[in-house]
Regions:
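Flexible, glycine-rich active-site loops centered on histidine and acidic residues
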Residues: 1-14, 72-95
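Structured beta->alpha junctions
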Residues: 41, 65-68, 72
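A short, GP-enriched loop/loop-strand-helix hinge that lies immediately N-terminal to
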Residues: 60-66, 92-93
């Protein structure tokens, strides 16, 4: 059975990003398959995944919602390609 988790810390609370990292690393250690972030006013979905990609090894990283109206299609594609490279192919683009 595959298990997915959500990791969304408010962008204004640095301490909660550290707590989310611990949460995701522990979930990865326990065999979770994927971590998802979403986008809303005040926080993008990609930056937290880049942070997590640098500090995890196996867990897949996905955007549950990436606002296509907030960025140009070319920027969405470039962002996805960059995060896929940074995460060694673990990134899943969800629109």
């Amino acid at each position: 059975m595959k298990i997915s988790i959500s990791a969304n810390a408010p962008p204004w609370k640095r301490q909660e990003f550290a707590e989310q990292l611990t949460y995701v690393q522990e979930a990865e250690r326990m065999g979770a398959d994927t971590v998802w972030t979403l986008e809303g006013w005040g926080q993008d979905a990609v930056t937290p995944l880049a942070y997590l990609a640098a500090r995890t090894h196996k867990i897949k990283l996905g955007t549950a919602i990436m606002q296509v109206t907030a960025r140009a299609p070319a920027m969405t594609a470039m962002t996805a390609m960059t995060l896929s490279a940074l995460s060694e192919g673990r990134f899943i683009l969800g629109l």
